[in-house]
């Protein structure tokens, strides 16, 4: 994922897009009866550089728009093309301010920065250190204890959506786990979600545009899924909450899937103009039959944990109140089983399928690359990243 540039206040425009609208009423956060001076405005621009916490793409777009309105007035630039995601988002944000006077835009910019500075300082003091922040920015958390490698999707504020960097980090974590002395490898999620799947802003962050993102995405996805196909040790998913997209389709490559009764399983590929991945076009019909697989992969039916169990996607469902205790007690028992015996048994179970799975993965990635460049997919992604936030 491309990093956001923080070195200059006027560059508060996202390389990643999520929500592009912020009600103007929320901008009058400070001194409504006062007029910000030019010096106040310049001080605010300098203050932006010192923010310790990323305020999110929604706010960064608003800062960009207010800066442009305060310095140049209403937007008169031609509207960028539909495929120019970043510049179109910037244009939309600026144009949405209409005829807002320069003085008002300047005041709103100063007030918004002041509010962000206060929030950032309070957040830093509340956390009492940088450890939590470092874990949050890492994307995944990998721990090894008692014979278990635990890989946690660790972006709870983003519902554990998976970035390009997280794909690479998971590949590395699995390669390390395949050769270390742990016995089983477990995936779970931090917070309320297991994972909301692929971070769609992966497609809007590539500097070379959609084609570069599609090419990179196909390569990374192919290696990512192959790593799961080839993983030699028992692989267990502890699905603590809603799972979406690739976090669901991957489950067909796991050896056991334990779910909380509050978990749901959703593969909205058609809604996004995309197609199945992670070998689900093969594993899902094999597990649940063609009709039930089509309900999920074609029509985007969301399954409850009980429904997923009935269709063979989930091994066992546990009550939310006892989920963590029951599952981890069981996993600690599994980790004491003879490791070589489990490796050999898994190889016997999976070996006849490996060649087929690699072929399916190759075909799915090739198809997905084409879908990502299709008008249907691009329109769906644009609709997603420009949607209004839920109140």
Swiss-Prot record:
Marked site positions, Important for catalytic activity: 277
Pathway: Lipid metabolism; fatty acid beta-oxidation
Chain positions of motif Microbody targeting signal: 389-391
Domain ACB span(s) in chain numbering: 37-122
Pfam families: ACBP (PF00887), ECH_1 (PF00378)
FT transit peptide: 1-36
Subcellular location per the Swiss-Prot or TrEMBL entry: Peroxisome matrix; Mitochondrion
CDD domains: crotonase-like (cd06558)
UniProt keyword terms in alphabetical order: Acetylation, Isomerase, Mitochondrion, Peroxisome, Phosphoprotein, Transit peptide
Tissue spec. comment: Liver (at protein level).
Positions where Phosphoserine occurs in the chain: 99, 117
GO BP annotation list: fatty acid beta-oxidation
Gene3D superfamilies: 1.20.80.10, 2-enoyl-CoA Hydratase, Chain A, domain 1, Lyase 2-enoyl-coa Hydratase, Chain A, domain 2
PANTHER family for the chain: ENOYL-COA DELTA ISOMERASE 2 (PTHR43684:SF1), PTHR43684
Free-text function comment from the UniProt entry: Able to isomerize both 3-cis and 3-trans double bonds into the 2-trans form in a range of enoyl-CoA species. Has a preference for 3-trans substrates.
Family (UniProt): In the C-terminal section; belongs to the enoyl-CoA hydratase/isomerase family.
Protein name (database record): Enoyl-CoA delta isomerase 2
Organism of provenance: Rattus norvegicus
Higher taxonomy: Eukaryota, Metazoa, Chordata, Craniata, Vertebrata
Gene giving rise to this polypeptide: Eci2
């Amino acid at each position: 994922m491309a990093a956001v540039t923080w070195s200059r206040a006027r560059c508060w425009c996202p390389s990643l897009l999520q929500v592009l609208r912020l009600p103007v009423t929320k901008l009058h956060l400070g001194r409504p009866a006062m007029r910000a001076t030019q010096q106040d405005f310049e001080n605010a621009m300098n203050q932006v550089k010192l923010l310790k916490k990323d305020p999110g793409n929604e706010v960064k777009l608003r800062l960009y728009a207010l800066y442009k309105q305060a310095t140049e007035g209403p937007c008169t630039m031609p509207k960028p093309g539909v495929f120019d995601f970043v510049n179109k988002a910037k244009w939309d944000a600026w144009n949405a301010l209409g005829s807002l006077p320069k003085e008002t835009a300047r005041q709103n910019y100063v007030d918004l920065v002041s509010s962000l500075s206060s929030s950032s300082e309070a957040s830093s003091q509340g956390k009492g250190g940088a450890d939590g922040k470092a874990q949050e920015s890492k994307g995944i958390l990998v721990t090894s204890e008692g014979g278990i490698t635990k890989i946690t999707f660790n972006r709870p504020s983003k519902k554990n959506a998976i970035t390009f960097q997280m794909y690479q980090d998971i590949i590395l974590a699995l390669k390390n786990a395949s050769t270390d002395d742990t016995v089983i490898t477990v995936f779970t999620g931090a917070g309320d979600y297991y994972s909301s799947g692929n971070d769609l802003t992966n497609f809007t962050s590539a500097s070379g545009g959609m084609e570069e993102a599609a090419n990179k995405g196909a390569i990374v996805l192919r290696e990512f899924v192959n790593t799961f196909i080839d993983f030699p040790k028992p692989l267990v998913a502890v699905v603590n909450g809603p799972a979406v997209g690739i976090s669901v389709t991957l489950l067909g490559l796991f050896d056991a899937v334990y779910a909380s009764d509050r978990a749901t399983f959703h593969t909205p590929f058609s809604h996004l103009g995309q197609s199945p991945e992670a070998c689900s076009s093969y594993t899902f019909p094999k597990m649940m039959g063609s009709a039930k697989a089509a309900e999920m992969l074609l029509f985007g039916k969301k399954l409850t944990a009980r429904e997923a169990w009935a269709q063979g996607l989930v091994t066992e469902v546990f009550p939310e109140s006892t989920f963590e205790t029951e599952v981890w007690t069981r996993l600690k028992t599994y980790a004491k089983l003879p490791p070589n015996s489990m490796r050999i048994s898994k190889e016997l179970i999976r070996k006849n399928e490996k060649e087929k799975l690699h072929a399916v993965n190759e075909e799915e990635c090739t198809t997905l690359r084409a879908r990502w460049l299709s008008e249907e997919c691009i329109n769906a992604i644009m609709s997603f990243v420009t949607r209004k936030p839920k109140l």
